[in-house]
UniProtKB/Swiss-Prot annotation:
<dbReference type="InterPro" id="IPR006202">
    <property type="entry name" value="Neur_chan_lig-bd"/>
</dbReference>
<feature type="transmembrane region" description="Helical; Name=3">
    <location>
        <begin position="297"/>
        <end position="317"/>
    </location>
</feature>
<dbReference type="InterPro" id="IPR018000">
    <property type="entry name" value="Neurotransmitter_ion_chnl_CS"/>
</dbReference>
<feature type="transmembrane region" description="Helical; Name=4">
    <location>
        <begin position="366"/>
        <end position="386"/>
    </location>
</feature>
<feature type="topological domain" description="Extracellular">
    <location>
        <begin position="387"/>
        <end position="409"/>
    </location>
</feature>
<feature type="glycosylation site" description="N-linked (GlcNAc...) asparagine">
    <location>
        <position position="99"/>
    </location>
</feature>
<keyword id="KW-0862">Zinc</keyword>
<keyword id="KW-0325">Glycoprotein</keyword>
<feature type="topological domain" description="Extracellular">
    <location>
        <begin position="19"/>
        <end position="233"/>
    </location>
</feature>
<keyword id="KW-1015">Disulfide bond</keyword>
<keyword id="KW-1003">Cell membrane</keyword>
<feature type="compositionally biased region" description="Basic and acidic residues">
    <location>
        <begin position="336"/>
        <end position="354"/>
    </location>
</feature>
<keyword id="KW-0732">Signal</keyword>
<keyword id="KW-1133">Transmembrane helix</keyword>
<dbReference type="GO" id="GO:0099094">
    <property type="term" value="F:ligand-gated monoatomic cation channel activity"/>
</dbReference>
<dbReference type="InterPro" id="IPR006201">
    <property type="entry name" value="Neur_channel"/>
</dbReference>
<feature type="signal peptide">
    <location>
        <begin position="1"/>
        <end position="18"/>
    </location>
</feature>
Length: 409
């Protein structure tokens, strides 16, 4: 009883002082600047001296409220997402309770390192930045403890990019209490969406929490459901690609014998090659379930290549037939040989030249019709495939083998 009275007396005296006041038996002074339960750089030799509160035969129940205030820096090329969270941890520690009739204090605040706190680790975190380096816990007369932790973290996320730029992905933040077992500690988690800004490329349209089953250590998981607004990708990727394809079809209306047609087609092909090289760097890639846009733009490249090759081949065949017809002599009556030089600057073409030209133009016209029909059909086919296509990602290495991932029962 004496240590508890000494603890309460020191807690009440803190109202008139500025330093860390709650010290005594069973408490320790701060040893690191950051909270130990998220400090990845803390030496392994540092051991907790305060034991978890005893809740009898049942595990200690810690109620967790996760307030998500911002999600930003969604990088699909690095498969990372940054978020700002506020954690509210609540539990009951009867060792900190006092008689409210003798000490009429509604609540006291204690340093985080003066009492037991659950040691949490974010499994997917690359780094964690704390807004408050010295959080304080609020303790009620019944031993009810409230601890608020504000943090900014960057985590890994397995984006589902098959339908990019209209993709929807679930990003998980898994919190593990590795210093306790499920027989000692149990979490009950809730999530609240407090995001007020919608001016983002990726917006959070859903927020869920769950307790993963069959775990050896206590844990809870927060799932952020992200959806791409797609406006940037449509303007930067789809519009230029469709414009080049439409320009290529319009180029088929130029006469085959016009020298500008070959230059026009080659210029479009070279321009699309430059666009395609930058496109490959802008689109994400994955070991499985790559974006459908990668295949779509590859098909567009093949269509432009086929259209350019058709123009070059038919123009070459037409020119070769024209030269062969010019080189062969045309038999004419002797009386008409004197008048051959009076035909003017545009003499009548040889029959072989007309035949080769008409054959090439007919083939070009047929190819143009087939090409237009093929392009239109490919667009409808891709739209249907986009709507109905599904892809299941390959299992992660930690799930494919029995000994991988977190320990399971």
């Amino acid at each position: 009883m004496a240590p508890r009275l000494l603890l309460l007396l020191l807690a009440f005296l803190r109202l008139g002082t500025t330093g860390p006041l709650v010290q005594g038996r069973g408490f320790r002074s701060p040893t690191v600047a950051w909270p130990s339960f998220f400090n990845f750089n803390q030496p392994q030799g540092v051991q907790e001296t305060i034991q978890i509160p005893n809740n009898g035969s049942a595990p200690l129940l810690v109620d967790v409220q996760v307030f998500v205030s911002n999600v930003f820096n969604v990088d699909i090329l690095r498969y990372t997402v940054s978020s700002m969270l506020l954690l509210r941890l609540s539990w009951v520690d009867t060792r900190l309770a006092w008689n409210a009739s003798l000490y009429p204090q509604h609540a006291v605040t204690l340093p985080w390192d003066s009492l037991w706190t659950p040691g949490l680790t974010i499994q997917e975190a690359l780094w964690v930045d704390w807004q408050d380096q010295s959080p304080r816990a609020r303790v009620g007369p019944d031993g009810h403890v409230d601890l608020y932790l504000a943090l900014t973290t960057e985590t890994n996320c397995d984006f589902e990019l098959l339908h990019f730029p209209r993709d929807q992905s679930d990003c998980n933040l898994s919190f593990y209490a590795l210093s306790n077992t499920v027989l000692e500690l149990e979490f009950r988690a809730h999530a609240v969406n407090e995001i007020v800004s919608v001016k983002r490329e990726y917006v959070v349209w859903g927020l869920e929490t769950q307790i993963p089953p069959r775990q050896l250590v206590p844990c809870f998981q927060v799932t952020l459901r992200l959806q791409n607004t797609a406006l940037k990708a449509i303007i930067a990727l789809l519009v230029p690609g469709e414009a080049l394809l439409l320009a290529d079809m319009c180029g088929g209306l130029l006469p085959l014998r016009a020298t500008e047609r070959i230059a026009y087609k080659v210029t479009l092909l070279l321009g699309y090659l430059v666009f395609h090289s930058s496109l490959v760097q802008a689109l994400p890639s994955s070991s499985s379930c790559n974006p459908l846009l990668i295949y779509y733009f590859t098909v567009l490249l093949l269509l432009l290549f086929i259209s350019t090759m058709e123009t070059v081949l038919l123009a070459a065949l037409q020119a070769r037939g024209h030269l062969s017809a010019r080189s062969s002599p045309i038999p004419t009556p002797r009386g008409e040989q004197q008048d051959h030089g009076d035909l003017g600057p545009h003499p009548e073409e040889a029959p072989g030249v007309k035949e080769s030209r008409s054959w090439a133009e007919a083939a070009d016209h047929i190819f143009f019709l087939v090409y237009v029909v093929g392009v239109v059909c490919s667009q409808f086919f891709f739209i249907g495939f986009w709507m109905w296509a599904t892809c299941k990602s390959d299992p992660a290495p930690g799930e494919a083998i029995p000994h991988g991932g977190q320990p399971r029962l």
